[in-house]
Amino acid sequence: ANGQVIDALVSHVDVMPTLCDLLQLEKPDYLEGTSFAEVFEDISAEPVSEIFAEVNFHTSYEPIRCVRTRRYKYIRYYDESWTKLNLSNMDSSASKDFYMRNDLAAQTKDTEALYDCYYDPDERKNLAQDPRYQEILEDLREKLRTFQIRTQDPILHGELEMKSEYKVNKKECLNASSKDPQDYDPRGRWQ
């Protein structure tokens, strides 16, 4: 597919199975993901109908799960005790500067988000509360839950453990590389 853009849904976990197929290597039993080798022969091939993503910690605790189909993206935020943006999880960038300049740090996020990626590729309008999208929302919730059960996602059992060796910013911290020990969760380390 030299010089072409391929729009197939793929995830990082799909890279290893793809390499195994391309190199004609046996895939280990424990391997997650689906090979997308077929798209190199047929750019219209769609090896999967949805992909999944998760975050637990970046620089602060912010457990998120997501399922993305060709058209829709469903996001579930699991830390209901903190509904603001976790700005320490946002790298220094023009986007973060914009948030800070416009006092968007206090903006809240919904526990669930649903976006129509065809009509809203910038994900500006959350459709999770729109009655017209409830069937789609329920379908994506079920896809995510089925995936979480199959992969034994620990978030299904409550807040995730923070180990003492983790260096984790407090949720209200603005700068991930802060030198102030007060900006770090006391359950982990700060240096």
What are these regions (language model features)?
Residues P47-A53, M162:
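WW-domain-binding short linear motifs
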Residues F57-A128, G158, S164-K170, S178-Q191:
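C-terminal, low-complexity/hydrophilic appendages and adjacent surface loops
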Residues A1-Y30, T34-E46, K125:
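Substrate-binding rim/cap in mid-to-C-terminal beta-strand-loop elements of soluble/periplasmic
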Residues P131-K167:
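A contiguous, mid-protein "functional segment" used to position or interact
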Residues L22-K27, F40-S44, R76, Y118, ...:
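A generic secondary-structure signal for well-formed alpha-helical elements
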Residues M16-C20, Q24, A37, I64, ...:
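Non-transmembrane alpha-helical segments in soluble domains
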Residues V10-P17, L31-T34, T69, K109-E112, ...:
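A structural signal for well-ordered alpha-helical segments within the folded catalytic domains
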